[in-house]
Amino acid sequence: TPFWNFRKPRKVPLHTTATQILTVEQIDAMTAEEINAVIRESLSYDEYRYQKENGIRITEPYRAEGLHKVLYQCPACGVEHEMASEGTQLFCKACGKRYEMDDLGQLHALEGETEFAHIPDWYEWQRGNVRAQIEAGEYAFEDEVDVYSLPRVWRYIPLGKAKLTHDPEH
């Protein structure tokens, strides 16, 4: 189940491999930066690429629901926070562009160009846009949020609403 849709669990096969990435001798001959680079590389993965390459079909009729939580900027019109999802579709409420998520985890525009068939490419495009906004001193985000406390590990307690502001001054 992807982190953006925990409410509807999926029955998908899970595969993992434990591998030794460095020996004691290799570690002794490396700097901390080199060791960290090897660790970062070994922990890098792409679930969508793995799904496609291994033919893992996810056929649930709700497979795209919640995807708008991570793919929040429309690549067709550039508007942020107007994406929505339902069933197998992701769509922009601002310009109407719609994408269908196939059973191999790829996106296809229902009309016109498919800007990003591979979900991580869309996500990285958004990250690049945010990075450019930060570097230009233009980044800002503001939203009303629900605030909870977790005094015990088994239940959140609602505390109320708050205004979250993230910009160069805050």
Where are these regions (language model features)?
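A cross-family acyltransferase "interaction/gating" segment
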Residues: 1-29, 33, 37, 58-78, ...
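Rieske [2Fe-2S] iron-sulfur-binding subdomain
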Residues: 8, 12-28, 32-46, 63, ...
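Short secondary-structure transition/capping segments
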Residues: 38-46, 95-106
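Mid-sequence helix-capping/hinge segment at a functional interface
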Residues: 49-57
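Short linear motifs in intrinsically disordered
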Residues: 62-63, 80-82, 160-165
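Short Cys/His-rich "knuckle" micro-motifs
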Residues: 82-87, 102-105
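Hydrophobic residues embedded in beta-strands of well-ordered beta-sheets
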Residues: 90, 169-170
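Long, charge-rich boundary regions
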Residues: 100-169
